Amino acid sequence: MTISTPVIIDSLIRHAQRTPEQTALLCGDQHWNYRQLVTRAHVMASALRQAGLSGQAILLNLPKSLDAVAAIYATWLSGNHYIPIDYSQPSSRIERIIAAAAPALIIDTAWLATLDSQPSFDAEQPVGRMVYHNPIAAILYTSGSTGTPKGVQISHEMLGFFIQWAVRDTQLTARDVLSNHASFAFDLSTFDLFASAYVGAATWIIRESEQKDCAALAQGLQRHAVSVWYSVPSILAMLEKSTLLNPTLGQSLRQVIFAGEPYPVTALKRLLPCLPQPCRVSNWYGPTETNVCVAYAIDRARLAMLKQVPIGLPLEGLTAQLEDENGDRHPLTAQLRLSGELLISGPCVTPGYSNVVVPRQAALHPHQCHATGDWVEMTPEGLVFRGRIDDMVKINGYRVELGEIESVLHQHPAIDRAALCVELGDLRQTLIMVISLQTGAVPPGLLELKQFLQQKLPSYMIPNKLVITESLPVNANGKVDRKQLAGVVAV
């Protein structure tokens, strides 16, 4: 299915015309209805058009706010695309992204102040549809292997395909209230913002200061009667550990979705009793280059039999293949235990990168195919993530998938989170376990953990060192930061 019209912006404007008083956004003590949101976006778009900007990259260096959302739509209404910046990240990385992106304009708080001081931009501008020419909706910057952030182009076709699938999968309606926990620079935010705009629902924008504040999250969840929650697993685990989340507080929840990293089965089992019984729980998978491309609905009854939460099966309309160690590609079939790098084809795939050349991807993307770099295995429950190809190391001549060891470690009752790193020696590499503990748990020793792992893994996959830390370092998206992990080990 090819989507040639900007379905999201058309839907947004339609809601502003038909249900102008419907709540669109909630943030702190502020809220906007759909007319207010579209009117503000038009004011910004008028300024961009008067500046002669069309088909350009507009960088958004703003904290999460109502204005930040309006700025996103303003870039589309003026025929441009947006580049969101995670406002909480170090200034040095922001500078690297700005240098790599070379935007035509930066919208920041100073730009907004100037805009508001100019009476020529009428706040009561009529709501209407703008002519649309730019096929690119956004450029999202992710970490690059060279140290230079990598700009992933997000097309309107990609967004339209994903949002229409997500709305069907979650049975989203205008009565829903979605939570937006992710930074606007993270691809998870595209569901929160654009699925709600597509159906006319409301979105609670969780500000940077609230993102790791369990009390603020619990209060907002209840206050706004959030019905659809979407975040990385570590945030859900944090809420569960706080003991603030329970079926009564979260009684409005009907969908809880996690993505971005594996959710250990043991941790997920602890989360489920905190949710209302009818609440559907899903695992969505996909790199920025495809957004969500594989999904799995959690079966509470079957969860007890699983060692790892599957990522599931490709979305309808997409094709998945597994490329084995020999470079041979295999279609997904009923053949179990087939493993390889996951390749995804279809309208969800990025057109390419904005500022770098990734040789293998550059060859695949024109054919709407993306090599994810993730090693997966086909099981009766669907695809299971086994680890990043980048995280596969050779130990004594054996290929070792760090993710497989981490998955087993997460089954230990004392462990909250676990990650592996490799210490390079003159003659050999040493595997090191880095773990954080469950509240009140007795710290396990190295021997105990080695014996635990030996029950499920071959001897060459057993780490020889252990580091226990209060918490594992995470990046801005809530995922374990492996570069910082090496620093924890070195201390």
UniProtKB/Swiss-Prot annotation:
Q: Which molecular function terms from Gene Ontology are attached?
A: ATP binding; ligase activity; phosphopantetheine binding
Q: Which reaction does it catalyse?
A: holo-[peptidyl-carrier protein] + L-proline + ATP = L-prolyl-[peptidyl-carrier protein] + AMP + diphosphate
Which keywords does UniProt give here?
A: Antibiotic biosynthesis, ATP-binding, Ligase, Nucleotide-binding
Signal peptide extent: none
Pathway of action: Antibiotic biosynthesis; prodigiosin biosynthesis
What is the deletion mutant like? Answer: Cells lacking this gene show a white phenotype and produce 2-methyl-3-n-amyl-pyrrole (MAP).
State its Enzyme Commission number(s). 6.2.1.53
One GO BP on record is: amino acid activation for nonribosomal peptide biosynthetic process
InterPro entries annotated for this entry?
AMP-bd_C, AMP-bd_C_sf, AMP-binding_CS, AMP-dep_synth/lig_dom, ANL_N_sf
GO CC term, one of those recorded: cytoplasm
Q: Name one Pfam family in it.
A: AMP-binding
Q: What protein family is recorded?
A: Belongs to the ATP-dependent AMP-binding enzyme family.
What's this chain's function? Involved in the biosynthesis of 4-methoxy-2,2'-bipyrrole-5-carbaldehyde (MBC), one of the terminal products involved in the biosynthesis of the red antibiotic prodigiosin (Pig). Catalyzes the conversion of L-proline to L-prolyl-AMP and the transfer of the L-prolyl group to acyl carrier protein PigG.
Q: State what protein this is by name.
A: L-proline--[L-prolyl-carrier protein] ligase
Gene it is expressed from: pigI
